[in-house]
Amino acid sequence: MSGTTVLLLTCLFLVTMATSDCDLYDDSCTGTEICCTPPGDYQGNCMEGEDCPSGGR
């Protein structure tokens, strides 16, 4: 792989890490919020259950 490809993948990984509040293995949501994850993904964002279209966990 070229250096540019590695750099792009690293940036993509960092952005992905920064935008997810929680994952199904480390649910850091507080109160009544659940970890709302897109179907097939284990990372998601904390939100109220009724606001989560995929059902979360």
Curated annotation (Swiss-Prot):
<feature type="disulfide bond">
    <location>
        <begin position="29"/>
        <end position="46"/>
    </location>
</feature>
<keyword id="KW-0732">Signal</keyword>
<keyword id="KW-0800">Toxin</keyword>
<feature type="disulfide bond">
    <location>
        <begin position="22"/>
        <end position="36"/>
    </location>
</feature>
<keyword id="KW-0960">Knottin</keyword>
<keyword id="KW-0964">Secreted</keyword>
<protein>
    <recommendedName>
        <fullName>Conotoxin Cal6.39</fullName>
    </recommendedName>
</protein>
<keyword id="KW-1015">Disulfide bond</keyword>
<feature type="signal peptide">
    <location>
        <begin position="1"/>
        <end position="18"/>
    </location>
</feature>
<comment type="function">
    <text>Probable neurotoxin.</text>
</comment>
<keyword id="KW-0528">Neurotoxin</keyword>
<dbReference type="GO" id="GO:0005576">
    <property type="term" value="C:extracellular region"/>
</dbReference>
<dbReference type="GO" id="GO:0090729">
    <property type="term" value="F:toxin activity"/>
</dbReference>
<feature type="disulfide bond">
    <location>
        <begin position="35"/>
        <end position="52"/>
    </location>
</feature>
